[in-house]
Amino acid sequence: MSEKIAVLGAGSWGSILASVLDENGHDVRLWSYNPKQVEELNTQHTNTHYIKDFTFSPSLVAYSDLASALTDVDAILFVVPTKAIRSVAGQVATILQDQHLQPQLIHASKGIEQQTYKRLSQVLEEEIPAENRQAVTVLSGPSHAEDVARKDITLVTAASASPEAAKYVQKLFMTSYFRVYTNPDIIGVEIGAALKNIIALGAGALHGLGYGDNAKAALMTRGLAEISRLGTSFGADPMTFIGLSGVGDIIVTATSSNSRNWRAGDELGRGEALDDVINHMGMVIEGLATTKAAYELSRERGVSMPITEAIYQVIYEGKDIRTAISDLMQREGRSEF
């Protein structure tokens, strides 16, 4: 099966997923809004700002013109930052209408839209009419782009309300080192993918403050409980959160310096000012906006999320990190489950 696939977003994850698809023999068009990045990808076959020491195949072609990238596509993979996905989807919708196309839609972005607090599949469904798309599938799981670039073993989930769409995405991506499972719980997979970045911020902060493994394990375990509570309030399957998009994604994101959210938390824990961390990170720190979204959703739905609330207070209200930790530890005793 060789498909025409447009990959929208040429950051670290988008460009490496494009490389996996290209390696599988698909006709891949990698789109970026940055003409200089497109030129580098097409002439030097590198993407040095995002992926160091990696050379892309010459068969992978980058585009700065969105309509050209979408010509006659069978599938579109969105890997743009959360804040840009609605705008890009709106542009895509116009082009699909003009070209009378109805491709498969996939997204591998991890976040919740600000203001609306909607999942990204909901945003895509709102912006792209049903007559110009198939069912939306989410590709997510414990996956650092750097590891996939080295062809380290990686397992992810393709989640969709349509079993056929999930299996289609599974077939697109499967390689000897990149294994894809299917899951019908698109709600749980998206919520797990987004909210684990909050826990990664906290884990990085604990490291920066000098806390040990016990504290980090406690954070990840109780953080996962919070994610599960919020997810199930939306109808997610609790089993999803002990799978690749729950436990798996938390482990890889909250224990590794490859995670930009972990690195941001680490710097905050070491006393860096938030604005300075944002300015020199050089890439989007999705966990910052997701913290606000999750905090607001928890209050709206009456879901207890004390860790998320503490991280929100540190980021948005300027609360001292050590005070926030102390307040968490001094909460009234209760049953674990």
Swiss-Prot record:
Binding site for sn-glycerol 3-phosphate: 110, 141, 143, 196, 249, 259-261
UniProt organism field: Levilactobacillus brevis (strain ATCC 367 / BCRC 12310 / CIP 105137 / JCM 1170 / LMG 11437 / NCIMB 947 / NCTC 947)
Coiled coil residues, start to end: none
Family: Belongs to the NAD-dependent glycerol-3-phosphate dehydrogenase family.
Active site: 196 (proton acceptor)
A GO cellular component entry from the record: cytosol
Binding site for NADPH: 12-13, 110, 145, 260, 284, 286
Protein name per UniProt: Glycerol-3-phosphate dehydrogenase [NAD(P)+]
